[in-house]
């Protein structure tokens, strides 16, 4: 039975593949081992479900984060493009931005004459904002966006892998449970048959 859970088959992130029970009698040689075996399968099933919940939470965070990164990148690129045009009027840019989930407002952004002086502040999280030159900010945002998209792809693959393994483990648990029910019924019938024998 221990060899079932020591499978070397894993996905790219090291999540082990669920074993499939073809014949319960080959796994449980002694009926007294049923509880131990069933508990191991239940434990593995709960681990898969926990991993799936964790990956789904990661996907939810990434699906919120990616649009924010895309919007921030788009704004930074617009600022850089505006400064590249070298507008002679030196008039500030009028921007509309989201202040809250349901609240938008306007802002005037003064573009410095020298592009090297063009800087943006990026929220890094944990109430930390850093000021970056526009080109560095764009490179950082592109890298963060690519990393987030890669993480989303990986997490989505893991969720699908876990979903398949959860199904396999649920089938295994059902087969083990049904085997035990059948064994108990057979044992009960055998005991009743023995009672009916008269010597």
Curated annotation (Swiss-Prot):
Cellular component aspect of the GO annotation: cytoplasm; prefoldin complex
Additional free-text comment from the UniProt record: Present with 6550 molecules/cell in log phase SD medium.
N-acetylmethionine carried by residues: 1
Protein name: Prefoldin subunit 3
Keyword terms of this UniProt record: Acetylation, Chaperone
Molecular function per GO: tubulin binding
GO BP annotations, alphabetical order: microtubule-based process; protein folding; tubulin complex assembly
Assigned protein family: Belongs to the prefoldin subunit alpha family.
Keyword Signal: no
InterPro entries xref list: PFD3, Prefoldin, Prefoldin_subunit_alpha
Record has Chaperone as a keyword: yes
SUPFAM superfamilies reported for this sequence: Prefoldin
Subunit structure, as described in the record: Heterohexamer of two PFD-alpha type and four PFD-beta type subunits.
Organism whose genome encodes this protein: Saccharomyces cerevisiae (strain ATCC 204508 / S288c) (Baker's yeast)
Role: Binds specifically to cytosolic chaperonin (c-CPN) and transfers target proteins to it. Binds to nascent polypeptide chain and promotes folding in an environment in which there are many competing pathways for nonnative proteins.
Pfam families: Prefoldin
